[in-house]
Amino acid sequence: MKRLFAWGAPLFALVALTLSLFSQADTKPSTIDSTSANYQQATLAGGCFWCTESDMEKLPGVVDVISGYAGGDVDNPTYKQVSSGKTGHIEVIQVTFDPKIVTYEQVLDNFFRHIDPTDDQGSFVDRGEQYRPAIFYHNAEQLEVAKRFMMEIDQLGIFKKPLKTELIEFKKFWPAEDYHQDYYKKNKVRYNYYRYASGRDQYLDEIFGADRNTHPKTLRQWIDEKNGQANVKAYVRPSDEQIRAKLTSLQYKVTQRDGTERPFDNEYWDNKEEGIYVDIVSGEPLFSSTDKYDSKTGWPSFTQPLNSSYIVTKDDNSLFYTRTEVRSRFADSHLGHVFNDGPAPTGLRYCMNSAAMRFIPKQEMAAQGYGEYLALFK
């Protein structure tokens, strides 16, 4: 599996051996009860389980990730047996997650964004069916979610090739040897060397962009954005005179002069009513109460927009560091900023100004022309 390039092996082995003496002492057994009835499991194959384990453990809502083997004919297989390709097993990770925090689709979303799901002959530098991508579904619901989501990803076309990720009924999981568990923590140098040499990150950068870690975007966001572009309505920006007459001094300062209102002293920071938020100038739909959460900042915060086609982001260098500004597409109103410290499923915090938005309660949405969004509240 982890075949390192010969030219770097001697020096690398010396460094890795030295560091491993120190890193192994840091390994601690998990104190989390991953068998709780409140949790669910996903069993996924995406090539080297050193890498897939590392990537999946970073997803909020994931309780535990164990590297192992599934799908074969031999009980309690060893790594040597599985890597030979003769047992029928595939290298997998078994993911225990809290469905109150992260859904099964969101687990799959994270999984697909860290593998090559189009290669059924292996995974990056590791060749053979024991490294092919697969989803071992635990029940009929997982199967349906996976089939539907994969169809949407194929239609999106982001991978440029058809998905060849196999759907296999889950039967049995065997944990891999202890030294494979949390390998990226215990053997950082060797892991980083292997990961770079495998070509995994280079491939993912090509598909999702070199900023995929600093500005993550889920496949669901890509899909919704593509679908949303087909359903975008044109909104009109009023004249400057009309805007001045319509807005309060604070609303004008925020939207037209890129101002910021005071935290905890604005209209919507603690609004818990169901409904949507639209641009105060043009009325274009921006955010939903279904994506609103308490960020403890004193400003209304959301994990994602209603339709990303209605917002525009740009670099803001007005302070001593670069922020990402959020503006409305048609009115070009300054709305606020987006940060990478939000909760699941997006990991984003759209920190908005109440003064830039108008709230429409759910019961008034149809009458005001926003009935298409009522399905969000069913």
Curated annotation (Swiss-Prot):
This is Peptide methionine sulfoxide reductase MsrA/MsrB. In the N-terminal section; belongs to the MsrA Met sulfoxide reductase family. In the C-terminal section; belongs to the MsrB Met sulfoxide reductase family. It comes from the Bacteria. Has an important function as a repair enzyme for proteins that have been inactivated by oxidation. Catalyzes the reversible oxidation-reduction of methionine sulfoxide in proteins to methionine. It catalyses: L-methionyl-[protein] + [thioredoxin]-disulfide + H2O = L-methionyl-(S)-S-oxide-[protein] + [thioredoxin]-dithiol; [thioredoxin]-disulfide + L-methionine + H2O = L-methionine (S)-S-oxide + [thioredoxin]-dithiol; L-methionyl-[protein] + [thioredoxin]-disulfide + H2O = L-methionyl-(R)-S-oxide-[protein] + [thioredoxin]-dithiol. It comes from Vibrio cholerae serotype O1 (strain ATCC 39315 / El Tor Inaba N16961). InterPro entries: Met_Sox_Rdtase_MsrA_dom, Met_Sox_Rdtase_MsrA_sf, Met_Sox_Rdtase_MsrB, Met_Sox_Rdtase_MsrB_dom, Mss4-like_sf. The keyword DNA-binding does not apply. One of its GO terms (cellular component) is cytoplasm. SUPFAM superfamilies: Mss4-like, Peptide methionine sulfoxide reductase. Its EC number is 1.8.4.11, 1.8.4.12. Keywords: Multifunctional enzyme, Oxidoreductase. HAMAP family: MsrA, MsrB. The gene is msrAB. GO terms for biological process: protein modification process; protein repair; response to oxidative stress. Residues 240-362 form the MsrB domain. One of its GO terms (molecular function) is L-methionine:thioredoxin-disulfide S-oxidoreductase activity. Residues 40-197 are annotated as: Peptide methionine sulfoxide reductase A. The active site is at residues 48, 351.
